Amino acid sequence: RQDLVTWQRVCQKTGAVLDYMYLDEEGHFTEEDLAKIDDKTKIVAFAAVSNVFGMKRPVKEIVAKAHSVGAIAIVDGAQSTPHMKTDVQDMDCDFFAFSGHKMCGSASTGVLYGKKAILAGMEPFLLGGDMIEYVKEQSTTFNELPFKFEAGSQNVEGAVALHAAIDYLRD
């Protein structure tokens, strides 16, 4: 739901159109729905594994389809990452996110992976802390990646706990 609400807000603010891909009776995307990814598509966002039915999605196929039309592919790995190996380079997604609490980590933790080339061209959305490199009276220079997206104090304890949870699940 959080993912959907976010995209609804983006569409309301920008005038973009939100479209959906539906599953067939066996829990797979139909060719008709995959054909909705066309040259007008800017972003394809989807879950690697359904949190309702547990169906695995063909991540590499969907990412390749998105890239074939110049769209960005965003994969929600909250349901998949705790249970299966995740290789963002292999799936070639542009962004990949998962929450820590679904991996035995603490609440309010998670990971957002983004391709460096895309992140480098993005503006920070939160201001302060380590994301600032230098401040002048009339301008500010933002820090390099990954720091330009790390405003405020970091949740060090949560990051350490998430690292331990990842190590535990790897074994």
Q: Would you name each region that the model predicts?
A:
Residues R1-D171:
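Pyridoxal 5′-phosphate
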